[in-house]
A protein has these predicted regions:
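Amphipathic alpha-helical protein-interaction segments
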Residues: 69-76, 104, 254-257, 261-264
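All-alpha helical catalytic cores of prenyl diphosphate-utilizing isoprenoid enzymes
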Residues: 14-23, 37-46, 68-70, 102-212
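Primarily interfacial, aromatic-capped hydrophobic alpha-helices that serve as membrane anchors
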Residues: 109-127, 224-273
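C-terminal intrinsically disordered extensions
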Residues: 153-181, 266-299
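Solvent-exposed loop and edge beta-strand segments that line ligand/cofactor-binding
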Residues: 34-42, 91-97, 151-156, 250-254
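Short, charged, amphipathic alpha-helical segments
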Residues: 91-94, 119-123, 183-186, 277-285
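Conserved N-terminal diphosphate/IPP-binding helix and adjacent helical/loop segment
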Residues: 1-80, 84-86, 117-124, 138-147, ...
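Acidic, Mg2+-coordinating active-site segments of isoprenoid diphosphate-utilizing enzymes
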Residues: 79-106, 166-177, 189-249
Length: 299
């Protein structure tokens, strides 16, 4: 886990404070998604991403703060939206989600970030979450087509909010998206997203299987079973967990996949390493954390 430096922790608290104040008068059920966002390491990373990018792509402090706040507003809105889609919140919470989206889009708009960029990435996130919901099972079994839909591209679409803040930063810095630096940052971000997701999927495998939740990690394990059996077949959660427990080669394969993704991220960032030390730190920490993948025991 990445430990924040004192200045980073102070910045995080500064950006959070308006949303915490806004939530104080709201019902606890609405505050809960915000608390989940504020407790999440990934959202701290989202919020600090402009700070870490700024030595490479300079922006003024006021622009960085607005970009961070817009990102955090969007994260709270997305958490409420997902809870509504998941049935954890009723649709009575939807107006607040829309208000937060408007606030987020307004902040991005004050920075002249293109609305089309935001709308496209929002559509990708919603479609990916609906796709995830469609793979949940109450029978403990998955059809091949359900798991085959959970691709690496789906993982990145699910995390499109991370790309929002990075692409907005690139745009505000006056760099084109096809610039070699922008391409390298996008490549590194995709690889880091996939590495983090794979590690999370393996750590959460037992809970996910019990709850009937599919994931990219579940899909990769299923593919190992299908290769051994000559083709895709209906598969249940017990077989997924069982294969993980009895197949050390599979565990090593996923650990190697994680290591390769971290190497790809590092390779993309290395030409700019002197300017983005905290991004380099993040990839190194992720690489080190991935060493536990092959030894995770679900029992």
């Amino acid at each position: 886990m990445l430990s924040l430096l004192p200045a980073e922790e102070a910045y995080w608290q500064q950006v959070c404070s308006p949303l915490i104040a806004l939530s104080a008068s709201l019902p606890p059920v609405i505050r809960c998604p915000l608390n989940q966002v504020l407790d999440s390491e990934i959202h701290r990373i989202f919020t600090l991403w402009p700070v870490w990018l700024s030595p490479l792509l300079p922006l003024t402090s006021s622009i960085i703060e607005r970009l961070s706040l817009a990102t955090l507003c969007g994260a709270w809105a997305a958490a409420i939206r997902d809870a509504c889609l998941d049935g954890e919140l009723t649709q009575t919470a939807a107006p607040l989600a829309r208000a937060l989206w408007r606030r987020s889009w307004h902040l991005f708009g004050t920075l002249a970030v293109h609305r089309e960029l935001l709308a496209d990435l929002e559509r990708r996130m919603v479609a990916a979450y609906r796709q995830e919901l469609a793979t949940r099972t109450h029978t403990g079994c998955w059809q091949p087509t359900q798991l085959q839909s959970l691709t690496a591209q789906w993982v990145c679409a699910r995390a499109a909010g991370w790309h929002v803040v990075q692409r907005a930063h690139i745009m505000l810095a006056g760099m084109k998206f096809d610039d070699p630096c922008a391409v390298a940052l996008s490549t590194a971000l995709d690889a880091l997203i996939l590495a983090r997701q794979l590690r999370d999927d393996v750590h959460d495998l037992a809970d996910d299987v019990r709850a009937g939740r599919a994931s990219w990690g579940v899909r990769l394990i299923a593919e190992s079973i299908w290769r051994a059996e000559g083709g895709p077949v209906l598969i249940d959660g017990q077989r997924i967990a069982g294969r993980w427990l009895i197949d050390p080669a599979l565990r090593q394969e996923l650990a190697s996949t994680h290591a390769t993704l971290c190497q790809q991220a590092m390779h993309a960032l290395m030409p700019y390493a002197a300017y983005i030390p905290r991004l380099i730190d993040l990839v190194m920490i992720e690489s080190e954390a991935g060493r536990t993948i092959a030894t995770i025991n679900l029992l």
